Amino acid sequence: MKRKLDANNVPSPEDSAGKSITAHSFETLKLDPRLLQALTQQKFTKPTPIQAEAIPLALDGKDVLARAKTGSGKTAAYLLPVLQSILQQKRNTPAHKSISALILVPTRELAEQVHRTAISFSAFSGKHVRSVNLTQKVSDAVQRSLLADLPDIVVSTPARAVANVNSSALSLERLTHLVIDEADLVLSYGYEEDMQSLAKAVPRGVQTFLMSATFTSEVDTLKGLFCRNPVVLKLEEKEDEGAGISQFVVRRCAEDEKFLLTYVIFKLQLVKGKCIIFVGDVDRCYRLKLFLEQFGIRSCVLNSELPVNSRIHVVQEFNKGVYDIIIAVDDQEVLGELRKNSKKQPRKSDQCSRDSEYDGAQTSRNNDQYSSEDDAETQPSKRPKKSAKEKDYGISRGIDFQNVACVLNFDLPTTSKSYTHRIGRTGRAGKTGMALSFVIPSDQFGKHKPTSIPSAKHDEAMLSKIIKRQDKLGREVKPYHFDMKQVDAFRYRMSDALRAVTRVAVQEARAREIRQELVKSEKLKRHFEENPEELRQLRHDGELRAARVQAHLKHVPDYLMPTKGRGSLSIGTGADVGFVGFKKTHENVIRKAREKNKGRGRGGKAGRGGKRVDPLKSFNSGGKH
């Protein structure tokens, strides 16, 4: 039976609520006991709304097109049905061996995350389920041998999947499941031609999952390529993305004051817990790291220049609590989330500006998260061209950062949508979080050339759009006020540190970091499993030492500390530091020595405790006794 078309000429979704019962526990989903055991080990207590709705539909063999917020559990929503189907197939035909599932993701970091999740869910399945990540940096010969063994699950970016299909290394003849995670980003990352090639290679009748945080024109395109009458799930959760996040903004902040306030925040421990700092470009990433190193504040960087294994390892160690501060550059976001246009489309900057915003009228009416006013957000007039290295790198979307207490927008994002995804890194899984943003007023832009960035020119206009969007979502962006009289006491120390971080120092640190991470990446690839103790050598928050070292800046004198925070940074010091009383607390060393030597004459014996002799009584003029 044909379904009616809605206002956007899209078939209306089937009413799945009346046909499926929402699961309140994983046991009611009738999953394999081995999967339930793995879920218990991973401390999954009950399914999230997207899992409770999508898993029963997927187990019935239906195509699923789901929209849910970032961090809602979409990965488990498609992995569990895929693993259940594979285990069922293995039970029926134990000797069966084929590639059953192809999972496509836009970035290498997300591919590694999905691959590890699949391994953890199949931990109690023995060798029945095998997963391969095609984005790993291995030779073509090694990759061909892995695919020749016919793993059950293949995780890849579209470009790597197409390359292996064209070389006949990846066979999709017996494929039963196709998953496209973060579907709204796949085409915007420049994979349009790859997805069209895969649509021709994927056999008919394959069950398809499209998972997305938003419904855009890209999702509609992918639905037309791969889906057959999918069940559309639009979950309107009570706690939407950002609902548990306290949002603050410093409205009037000079360009060099960003560094001052960042120093004060971390040195005085105004923020407790792990923090992600978003900056505008790679140079500022290293400039801020070198600046914080002057004060003994350790941090690690995350950008597209680093080897993929190093980037993955940084995220993993951050989630384990090894690092507290990550300075991240989201290259896709900095470029305005430009879509890789086809060669037929013009490359003019104004056309790119129009194409970079793809919300508005193309979004369904039920998706009110993004308003039409944001379609024409201010963008820089010139944008650098996306490199192949940046194509498969992304931070603000998809990557699972755990237990992030604060997101610091050191440089304000270039779109209000990017702001929403940035602050979505904190306040996840029902927890609270904080987001703090620095805004450069127009009259302060360009006054401090060494720390100036072009995107800051539009900060005030972008802030108004951000506030407008957050107001529509029922959230408030509150002003954050610093006591500048107390902050100014640290200004001279900030100036000394900032002068030491020159452009040459930043370039040297950038090159040195890449060289170090290349070596570490080889160690990660070859010795990670064989020599776990070498993980201690692979710290990513070490000092780069490219700037002039000023040891005195690492310690804050007590007289600079605010009254409430005095003594909180130094361990073992009390409130009487620097106090001189009237009574001496230590014995006078000179007086003690005098008392000890009192009564010892020049003619006495050299030895201590000897008998005292009167020289007049012992004097003999004749020399004889």
UniProtKB/Swiss-Prot annotation:
Gene3D superfamilies: P-loop containing nucleotide triphosphate hydrolases (3.40.50.300). One of its GO terms (molecular function) is ATP binding. Keywords: ATP-binding, Helicase, Hydrolase, Nucleotide-binding, Nucleus, Ribosome biogenesis, RNA-binding, rRNA processing. Residues 1-21, 339-393, 590-625 are annotated as: Disordered. A motif (Q motif) lies at residues 24-52. The keyword RNA-binding applies. InterPro entries: DEAD/DEAH_box_helicase_dom, DEAD_box_RNA_helicase, Helicase_ATP-bd, Helicase_C-like, P-loop_NTPase, RNA_helicase_DEAD_Q_motif. Residues 55-233 form the Helicase ATP-binding domain. ATP binds at A68, K69, T70, G71, S72, G73, K74, T75. It catalyses: ATP + H2O = ADP + phosphate + H(+). A motif (DEAD box) lies at residues 181-184. Disulfide bonds: none annotated. It is an enzyme of class 3 (hydrolase). One of its GO terms (biological process) is rRNA processing. Residues 599-610 have a biased composition (Basic residues). Residues 361-370 have a biased composition (Polar residues). Its EC number is 3.6.4.13. Residues 347-357 have a biased composition (Basic and acidic residues). PANTHER family: ATP-DEPENDENT RNA HELICASE RHLE-RELATED, DEAD-BOX HELICASE 56. Belongs to the DEAD box helicase family. DDX56/DBP9 subfamily. ATP-binding RNA helicase involved in the biogenesis of 60S ribosomal subunits and is required for the normal formation of 25S and 5.8S rRNAs. The Q motif is unique to and characteristic of the DEAD box family of RNA helicases and controls ATP binding and hydrolysis. This is ATP-dependent RNA helicase DBP9. The lineage of its organism: Eukaryota, Fungi, Dikarya, Ascomycota, Pezizomycotina.
